[in-house]
A protein has these predicted regions:
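Residue-level signal for inorganic ion chemistry
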Residues: 4, 33, 71, 110, ...
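Short beta-strand-loop/turn "lid" adjacent to the catalytic site in phosphate-handling enzymes
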Residues: 21-67, 94-101, 132, 136-149, ...
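Active-site core segments that coordinate phosphate-bearing ligands/cofactors
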Residues: 79-94, 105-140, 149-173, 186-308
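Charged, glycine/proline-rich intrinsically disordered loops and linkers
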Residues: 51-69, 158, 165-178, 299-301
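Phosphate-binding loop and its immediate beta->loop->alpha context
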Residues: 1-23, 58-94, 102
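N-terminal glycine/serine-rich phosphate-binding loop of ATP-dependent small-molecule kinases
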Residues: 1-54, 92, 120, 172, ...
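Residues immediately flanking
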Residues: 37, 47, 72, 128, ...
Length: 308
């Protein structure tokens, strides 16, 4: 599950411009840009902020490409992180879990399988942070992404004690390649840079948000913004999200981060990494006689199975 970051820039330069023109919106009315992205999707960049997969000698190296959220190649690293946290409180607010989809296991996977990528990477960040950084011409991080997927705490910062216990090199890697100004949800990550002002024809006063994890943005979309309200965002995977004024350890959650959805509240996340994908898998495994019957009834396979 790898992607090419150039596709993201093509959408920014062409897709967004098309939407602005097709919607016939008055560009003077555009005052802000919100960014959401599926997480944890990780990108490795050089000193010029260029994705490493653009380097001619790295084009055939899969680890130079964007690691999509559902890349699960770092399971061994995730398991080891859990093992090293036994009898510690490092994962109390992560449900005593580490997911192979998260940033730190993916960094360790690259260290183990493609150390040359790690050596040449100047920046490692969430793809959502990459988009925000491109739009603002700055190197910034969102508290939502780095909090849920990078073991960063609003008060204590990164858990370097935990990182050192996992790998003595890890604190240095994170400090040099991941640390940057962290912007909270609800704040501005900066003004839209001149390049994109010109590309989109927008004002220099347009503000860009820090990126928010895509499922978390759904909480805002349905208006479940009060403490105690619960939202299930169902799709390829499913995220269960809730807000509260307190932070307490809860088993089986996958994180709780302050100010990550609504300022002043802790955002709690749990969920299932495969939901829609499992339905599709089940459909694709249906025997031929089921598929034939569904076709006879002019029904999708899953709908036909539900009626059996």
């Amino acid at each position: 599950f790898l992607q090419n970051a150039d596709d993201y820039l093509q959408i920014l330069e062409q897709g967004v411009q098309y939407v602005l023109e097709d919607s016939k919106v008055n560009k003077n009315d555009v005052v802000g840009i919100g960014v959401d992205f599926t997480s944890s999707t990780i990108i490795f960049l050089d000193e010029q902020f260029e994705p490493l997969h653009r380097h001619e000698d790295l084009k055939t190296n899969p680890h130079a490409y964007v690691k999509l959220w559902k890349h699960h190649g770092a399971q061994d690293e995730a398991n080891y992180m859990i093992q090293m946290s036994k009898n510690k409180n490092w994962l109390d607010y992560y449900g005593s879990s580490v997911n192979s989809e998260w940033m730190i296991p993916k960094i360790l996977e690259v260290k183990h399988e493609a150390p040359e990528i790690l050596r040449r990477a100047r920046y490692i960040m969430e793809a959502g942070d990459y988009i925000t950084s491109i739009l603002t011409n700055s190197n910034v991080r969102s508290n939502c992404g780095i909090g849920f997927k990078g073991f960063w705490d609003n008060d204590a910062g990164f858990n370097y004690e935990f990182f050192h216990s996992v790998d003595p090199d890890l604190p240095k890697i994170v400090k040099e390649k991941c640390e940057a100004p962290i912007i909270s949800i609800g704040e501005s990550a900066g003004r839209l840079c001149k390049d994109y002002q010109q590309i989109w024809g927008l004002s220099q006063d347009v503000q860009v948000s820090p990126f928010i994890i895509d499922a978390h943005s759904g909480v805002l979309g349905v208006g479940a913004i009060e403490a105690g309200e619960f939202t299930a965002v169902i799709g390829t995977s499913t995220c269960h999200l809730m807000l509260d004024s307190r932070q307490v350890p809860i088993s089986s959650i996958t994180g709780s981060v302050k100010n990550a959805i609504i300022p002043g509240l802790y955002a709690y996340e749990a969920g299932q990494p495969a939901v829609g994908d499992l339905f599709e898998y089940s459909k694709n495994q249906a025997p031929k006689h089921i598929v034939d019957k569904a076709n006879e009834h002019h029904m999708p396979v899953l709908n036909y199975l539900e009626e059996l």
